[in-house]
Amino acid sequence: MTPQLLLALVLWASCPPCSGRKGPPAALTLPRVQCRASRYPIAVDCSWTLPPAPNSTSPVSFIATYRLGMAARGHSWPCLQQTPTSTSCTITDVQLFSMAPYVLNVTAVHPWGSSSSFVPFITEHIIKPDPPEGVRLSPLAERQLQVQWEPPGSWPFPEIFSLKYWIRYKRQGAARFHRVGPIEATSFILRAVRPRARYYVQVAAQDLTDYGELSDWSLPATATMSLGK
């Protein structure tokens, strides 16, 4: 093979459009990861999205692992995924009140390379319960409205790891909600509500000891106060 022919072959192979192959995008995108302990203390659930890379339609798989502590050479364990292409995983071996953070590593594996995101967290700091369930309203005498609800079904031990609650409510046509709480029971009586008015009520939950953040608000429950009630 002459030197000229060899040079031509090298140039052709290094030019993806010339050889019919697709080259890698200009830059690999990083997974955007978030973790939440809505099932405290039995699990931490993490999920992620991957911004699309320019000019790429190739399938991407993910490898999710975690370690306890910031040491780069610490032992790692798999964060459980349903399939390699799943965009979520679960940590089931949760150490409570650990001073060392967990570090989740999510690696996106592309045909042309990989990109990784590292997310440190303390389990108690990412507690966010799911919304309370079964919110129901019962008009009572003397302009009172009873609100009852259940802890979120995903919260495994409400009798041990207690929750506190907030209520927000407004009557139909009002511009803003009134807010009541914290409440350490699963019922509450709203007083001085207006006769014939229709009320919208929602409930949110938080860890009793103030770890983490408030849940999202529950689905609204509605009730109309009768005349004389």
From Swiss-Prot:
InterPro entries: FN3_dom, FN3_IL27B_N, FN3_sf, Hematopoietin_rcpt_L_F3_CS, Ig-like_fold, IL11/IL27_subunit_beta
Gene Ontology CC annotations of this record: endoplasmic reticulum lumen; extracellular region; extracellular space; plasma membrane
CDD domains from the UniProt entry: FN3
Signal sequence, renumbered to the chain: 1-20
Biological processes annotated in GO: humoral immune response; positive regulation of alpha-beta T cell proliferation; positive regulation of type II interferon production; T cell proliferation; T-helper 1 type immune response
Principal subcellular localisation of the protein: secreted
One GO molecular-function entry: cytokine receptor activity
Keywords, in A-Z order: Cytokine, Glycoprotein, Repeat, Secreted, Signal
Free-text function comment from the UniProt entry: Associates with IL27 to form the IL-27 interleukin, a heterodimeric cytokine which functions in innate immunity. IL-27 has pro- and anti-inflammatory properties, that can regulate T-helper cell development, suppress T-cell proliferation, stimulate cytotoxic T-cell activity, induce isotype switching in B-cells, and that has diverse effects on innate immune cells. Among its target cells are CD4 T-helper cells which can differentiate in type 1 effector cells (TH1), type 2 effector cells (TH2) and IL17 producing helper T-cells (TH17).
Protein's name according to its UniProt entry: Interleukin-27 subunit beta
Organism: Homo sapiens
